[in-house]
Regions:
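Gly/lys/ser-thr-rich phosphate-binding loops in alpha/beta enzymes
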Residues: 1-28
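Short, charged, surface-exposed secondary-structure boundary motifs
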Residues: 10-14, 147-154
């Protein structure tokens, strides 16, 4: 079965629908694997994911500088690797990267600064065209596989009493 997510996510009805979907999903996982998922398990996972998003946002923030030290292609690969790698392992890698980035040389001067807007990107061809062929910098984006992936921490208002609602 699928985990359904409403198209409009800001309304109270959509939030309640999604909460019920998450509860159903947790119940199915518990039944399938014979292991209870506790509130503490959820809180720990939320903390790990929030830490991951926070570190990615720090890296992405550098792209706005006059001379960024990370390219749009590299930013895309960081996000993609976050989607495909165990979050605890990815957090370790991000911590190492954050320690090394200040020593990195800024990118060579680009011809233009570009904001990429669109839907999820499933490959890097557009980024390669912009950065390698044209010589511009993709300094920010508004895509699901870019900055939107890191938007917002989990609301702490629900975290203590109902971590599933916080998700």
């Amino acid at each position: 079965r699928f985990l359904y997510m409403p198209g409009i996510i800001d309304s109270p009805d959509a939030k309640n629908f999604y909460y019920k979907e998450l509860k159903r999903f947790v119940n199915e996982l518990e039944s399938l694997f014979g292991k209870r998922i506790t509130d503490d398990d959820l809180r720990e996972a939320i903390q790990i994911y929030d830490e991951n998003r926070s570190m990615i946002m720090k890296i992405f923030h550098d792209r706005k500088n006059d001379r960024p030290i990370i390219s749009g292609k590299e930013a895309y690969l960081i996000t993609l690797s976050s989607m495909l790698t165990d979050k605890q392992d990815h957090n370790k890698l991000l911590k190492e990267l954050l320690q090394k980035l200040p020593d990195r040389e800024p990118l060579k001067q680009g011809v233009s600064r570009v904001m990429l807007v669109g839907s999820p990107m499933d490959n890097m061809k557009l980024l390669e065209l912009i950065e390698d062929d044209i010589g511009a910098w993709v300094v920010t984006d508004d895509t699901c596989t870019g900055t939107r992936y890191t938007w917002g921490e989990t609301p702490s208002t629900y975290l203590e009493k109902d971590p599933l609602r916080a998700i």
